[in-house]
C-alpha cells in the first residue's frame, strides 16, 4: 500500500503499540510545536507579542 509494509497483518500489528505511544507524545507540546509554520501560515504568538503582553500585565498591578 505504499507505506513500506509488504503484508497487511504486519501493518496492523505495528499500529497498536505505535498508536499508543503517539497519543501520549501528542499531549506534551513543546515550545517548537507552538511556533510551527504550517504551509506559510504562522501559528503561535511571535516573541514580540509575548513580550508586549507580559510587560502590559506588569503595569496593571496596583498596590
Curated annotation (Swiss-Prot):
Disulfide bonds: none annotated. InterPro entries: OCC1. Residues 1-10 have a biased composition (Polar residues). Residues 1-39 are annotated as: Disordered. Belongs to the OCC1 family. This is Overexpressed in colon carcinoma 1 protein homolog. It comes from Mus musculus.
Amino acid at each position: 500500500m505504499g507505506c513500506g509494509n509488504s503484508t497487511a497483518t504486519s501493518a496492523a500489528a505495528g499500529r497498536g503499540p505505535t498508536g499508543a505511544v503517539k497519543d501520549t507524545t501528542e499531549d506534551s507540546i513543546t515550545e517548537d510545536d507552538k511556533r510551527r509554520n504550517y504551509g506559510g501560515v504562522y501559528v503561535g504568538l511571535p516573541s514580540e507579542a509575548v513580550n508586549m503582553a507580559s510587560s502590559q500585565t506588569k503595569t496593571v498591578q496596583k498596590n
